Amino acid sequence: MSDAARPLDPDEAARRLGPWLGAGGQAGGVVLAVSGGPDSTALMGCAAALPPRVPVLVATVDHGLRPESGEEAAGVAALAGRLGLPHRILTWRGEKPRTRLQEAARAARYDLLLGLAREAGAGAILTAHTLDDQAETVLMRLCAGSGPAGLAGIAPARRLGGLLLGRPFLDLPKARLVATCAAAGWPFAVDPGNAAARFARARLRRVMPLLAAEGLTPARLARLAARLRRNEAALAAAAEAARPSLAAAPAGPGRLALDAAGLAALPEAVALRVLADAIAALRAGERRPERLERLEEALFGRILPAIAAGTPLRLTLGGALLDLAGGRLLLAPEPPRRRTKRAG
Ligand SMILES: Nc1ncnc2c1ncn2[C@@H]1O[C@H](COP(=O)(O)OP(=O)(O)OP(=O)(O)O)[C@@H](O)[C@H]1O
């Protein structure tokens, strides 16, 4: 059997899940997010086989978006019962948006899982994201023009609402999880959305074999994500360390000021990060971060050349008004747009 499609053996499963679920794992136990697909079914099966372990609660979110979703959730409940694990179905109620439905479904899913984990006193939520998910995410973000932060992909572990969100299978090929289910006789569902060409992820999945033939394998894309995650941490630290040397006279409440010469003296990647962070701090929570490509155009195409030439500059970027004058780059929230008066 090829290594890429070998079922997980109990030792390997224990090594991966032990830190989360083992005797010394998460105090209060964990919630397993199980959709009923092969990846999360394998997560549930492997967790059930792990002795001894902290309390485990399995949760399936029924988004109510496909006619068969209720049946799938019931299928997970049945298998959880067979495996001796408690199971809950969480239903996404309320208005479903017409646009960005997948994004809204994901946000609702994490909210529901978090609510359950808090109610159960669990310390962590585990999902079954795989190396294939990671590779697809990186590819999708590459297509969308993401920078290092986006290309760092799915985090192996991160904080979520005061709890931990873990992905213990993130470096495992999906084929191994499918093989694990098959070998153990755990039934799983196949999401038709996975093949629907109207979703970008599904379209990219079809391109994957072509890219792999050229050397851009899922494993390589996943390694790129891990590498960029390390670089991203270094960049964040460098931007943080540069901040004191950039402090310029405060520009009034709700405003920021950066020393222009100091900004220009930084390595370009650090300067870009400082600018992005400053705009994000100014517009906290009010809008989505500006596209990296626009930030790059503004910084490298206009702001740094103006600093070098000593010329003043005004521009709006990411909801902020930037004003370069007197050796300072002032940032203020962009004023509400005025209607242009129609002549005559
Ligand atoms: N309906 C669901 N109920 C419970 N868990 C789910 C559900 N859908 C997905 N998950 C969890 O999320 C993991 C990833 O699923 P999938 O790739 O379909 O979601 P995604 O939308 O890409 O998720 P993410 O936004 O977290 O990347 C699954 O392995 C599972 O652990």
Curated annotation (Swiss-Prot):
GO molecular function, one term: ATP binding
Record-listed E.C. numbers: 6.3.4.19
GO cellular component: cytoplasm
UniProt keyword list: ATP-binding, Cytoplasm, Ligase, Nucleotide-binding, tRNA processing
Catalysis: reaction(s): cytidine(34) in tRNA(Ile2) + L-lysine + ATP = lysidine(34) in tRNA(Ile2) + AMP + diphosphate + H(+)
Keyword flag Protein biosynthesis: no
Protein family (similarity comment): Belongs to the tRNA(Ile)-lysidine synthase family.
Protein's name according to its UniProt entry: tRNA(Ile)-lysidine synthase
Gene this protein is translated from: tilS
